[in-house]
Amino acid sequence: MTRAKANVEPISFPPPRAGEVPRNAAEGGRTELPLALPFTNPPSPILIEPLVRAALAEDLGRAGDITTDAIIPPTEIARAVIAAREPGVVAGLIAAGLAFKLIDPNVQLTVRAPDGSEVTKGTAIAELEGPARALLTAERVALNFLVHLSGVATATQQLVKAVSSTKARIICTRKTIPGIRILQKYAVRCGGGLNHRFGLDDAVLIKDNHIAAAGGVAASIKALRGRLGPMVKIEIEVDTLAQLEEALAAGAEAILLDNMPPELMKRAVAITNGRATLEASGGVTLERVRAIAESGVDFISSGALTHSPHALDLGLDFL
């Protein structure tokens, strides 16, 4: 039976909140330390479309959706709702919406809980109407993006809430799933976190293997200063207080405290005394993050936000 098509709004997103910094359409540009960017507006569909197309091509294979095409008439119109099956934070509607639109541009998606929204079990996130074949064919790819990115946003918000009333801000890292970093970084922002560098080209971060290859902390910083000049801000990773003092003496503007216990971080904060931005990294869990924040560091970075978040349980049901 063919259902009458109702008038529904096309997919749309709210404008950036006051104080947010928009990125350009290419997500380009460079930023200086501190490496934290407070914006939540979604990345351009121009950048997202190739990722969604690749996911659809992977799912459709050579023959397409042979089950749906065999049993659903091409004229069948259907309505569906995407709803939360557990509490969390929504992220990824831009990718989910594109998945349906790329299968059939006649699909209409109405957002009920925009990206960045906190939802409870049963909350309607979006409503869909259009060719039933398109809804069925795009369903899994759309949900794959949505449950993963909402999981990233939810995990981020949990850390953000845990460090509330401290000065520490939660940031993500480059430990992302290959190919979808731009979406994962966006999901972190939806959860209230901030972004560290997007790639190797937009900020300097001297890691432990750089130090080993270059011959030490001071040697690494000196080499960078000679190559990049005095205007480029330098962040360097240290795991001892001796390395911290060496980095400060060499003029590092930001220092990453790698896998230090909170007690040692407190000493690092006292030694630094405001001379550099301090980032804590390593072993960041929901149980430990408050103690890390109370050490007095400026930023807390977590790779787990993007490399191993729990997927938020969401479902799509026909009405």
Model-assigned labels for residue ranges:
Residues 3, 36-250, 254, 263-271, ...:
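Acidic/glycine-rich phosphate/pyrophosphate-binding loops and surrounding catalytic core
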Residues 3-6, 16:
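Compositionally biased, low-complexity intrinsically disordered regions
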Residues 10-12:
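Generic short N-terminal amphipathic or hydrophobic helices
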Residues 18-20:
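Glycine-biased, low-complexity coil/linker segments
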Residues 22-24, 33-35:
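Intrinsically disordered, low-complexity segments enriched in serine/threonine/proline/glycine
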Residues 259:
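C-terminal active-site rim and adjoining tail of enzyme catalytic domains
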Residues 315-319:
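Active-site loop ensemble at the mouth of alpha/beta enzyme cores that anchors a bound cofactor
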